[in-house]
Amino acid sequence: MAKKSMIQRELKREKLVAKYAQKRAEFKAIILDINSTEEQIWEAQIKLQKLPVNSSASRVQRRCKVTGRPHAVYRKFGLCRNKLREYAMAGDVPGLKKASW
């Protein structure tokens, strides 16, 4: 089980990403726009750098909904491999069954 502080840190990052997503997209659009002048690009880059580091989407890490484990988390289920196997064996995940051939 992950520490509560780690789970809260990830939730805080998700909130920051949502809060600054539009600003970040606007600055990136200016930077990638062919018609932007060098001065506009520089200003956009500086403003982008001044945004909080944790507001970047790449800083958010998926965690297991049950245990908070950060590795081996299946996106489709939101569970880590251990809990997914446990729930699948108990029959709690509809449509999922153990493969045998």
From Swiss-Prot:
A GO cellular component term found in this entry reads: small ribosomal subunit
Asked whether the keyword Aminoacyl-tRNA synthetase is assigned, the reply is no
As for what it does, the entry says: Binds 16S rRNA, required for the assembly of 30S particles and may also be responsible for determining the conformation of the 16S rRNA at the A site.
Complex formation: Part of the 30S ribosomal subunit. Contacts proteins S3 and S10.
Q: Fetch the HAMAP family from UniProt.
A: Ribosomal_uS14_1
Q: What is this protein called?
A: Small ribosomal subunit protein uS14
Q: Which family does it belong to?
A: Belongs to the universal ribosomal protein uS14 family.
Organism from which the protein derives: Francisella tularensis subsp. holarctica (strain LVS)
